Amino acid sequence: MLLKIKRVPTVVSNYQKDETVEEGGCGRNCLSKCCINGARLPLYTCKNLDKSVGENTESPVTFLESLVIGEWEDRFQRGLFRYDVTACETKVIPGKYGFIAQLNEGRHLKKRPTEFRVDKVLQPFDGNKFNFTKVGQEELLFQFKASTNDDDSEIQFLASMPLDADNSPSVVAINVSPIEYGHVLLIPRVLDCLPQRIDHKSLLLALQMAAEADNPYFRLGYNSLGAFATINHLHFQAYYLAMQFPIEKASSLKITTTNNGVKISKLLNYPVRGLLVEGGNTIKDLADTVSDASVCLQNNNIPFNILISDSGKRIFLLPQCYAEKQALGEVSSTLLDTQVNPAVWEMSGHMVLKRKEDYEGASEEKAWRLLAEVSLSEERFREVNTMIFDAIGFSSHEEEEEEELEEQNSMNGGSFTIVHCPSVKEEAVSN
């Protein structure tokens, strides 16, 4: 059953206020030096998670349902969002894959415009442009960090702790232009003003948050520059949606398993070509493998998206080329007219549509066509995979494996074994 909350009037968010500086602070109660002195937030310290990401442990439900959702609803009641996302229509598109469509006209009309080049994945942080130090402190929910004590097996929650400017905290904030219920941002080391680029510590923190939430319906996503990130300040997005994403149901073919137990597979029969990375002896093993691959993509100016799924147990790494095709005039006017920017949620099968006509006419064929335009070609995907496997220190024998499979396919009457990896129980999907 989907959660429902009361609709309230929307007021201007601090994201939208002007930036006129006033004596004694800028007047916006922001995170910059002008206002941060004396700022306090709750602090959530999760237990030490240096364990196998496949290990089942009991996590407290208060993290997601009481803290994230409770604080998010509080900000909703205070009118800090640009529109009421709970009033947006959502449906599952009929068909084999179960693409999810949402009509979100407010996000199109009121979302902050992109303020950087879309043809470069790595760009320096620019403090003159919008960044998260300019948000109002009321949009922040809490500080989040992982324990560094190997013996810590319990969470620690402090209701009010100073924001330590000398040791830049990681914070969770509302997304004032939400896509779904409980849509938040994880902003690693917010005061360090890091540009939107993956690093090992930040990706590990995102996996720790997913593991701590311990709910398959709470997912984190990352968009690089050039893959429809709109703010060049390091952040991950997360929200709660109580249904399975199409990408989570996709079949996969194992390419290799690393020495530390991380399994890397490629997606099959899905419109976007991508990699599924899972397992590992510890959560850090998984984070390091995906970080190495992501850094490789960044350094080679290849835009990409990341979906952290199944409570941090599975990560989908999805290189894309839609912005490049747009710039080259290779995208059809029909797709351009929809004004859909295929970021991580759309790549995963949650289609955020901005026009009622597109929502009413949504079909599996149209969703597939859009995502197929986003995907790298098979040839380019092979090239990118070679780069990735070189970066993580492994050779991809994908071509040889495929030739063997084709041979087995012809010998066995046209069948071979692939891996089907649903992330949540089927009975839960039907709700």
UniProtKB/Swiss-Prot annotation:
One GO MF term attached to the UniProt entry: guanyl-nucleotide exchange factor activity
Q: Could you tell me which residues belong to the region Disordered? A: 398-417
Question: So what does this thing catalyse?
Answer: GDP-beta-L-galactose + phosphate = beta-L-galactose 1-phosphate + GDP + H(+)
Tell me the InterPro entries matching this sequence: GDPGP
Broadest EC class? transferase
Induction or repression: By jasmonate, ozone and high light. Circadian-regulation, with a peak in expression at the beginning of the light cycle.
Catalytic residues (UniProt): H235 (tele-gmp-histidine intermediate)
UniProt-listed GO biological process terms: L-ascorbic acid biosynthetic process; response to jasmonic acid; response to ozone
Knockout phenotype, as recorded, reads: No visible phenotype and slightly decreased ascorbate levels; due to the partial redundancy with VTC2. Vtc2 and vtc5 double mutants show growth arrest immediately upon germination and are not viable.
Per its record, how is this protein called by name?
Answer: GDP-L-galactose phosphorylase 2
Which organism is the protein's source? Arabidopsis thaliana
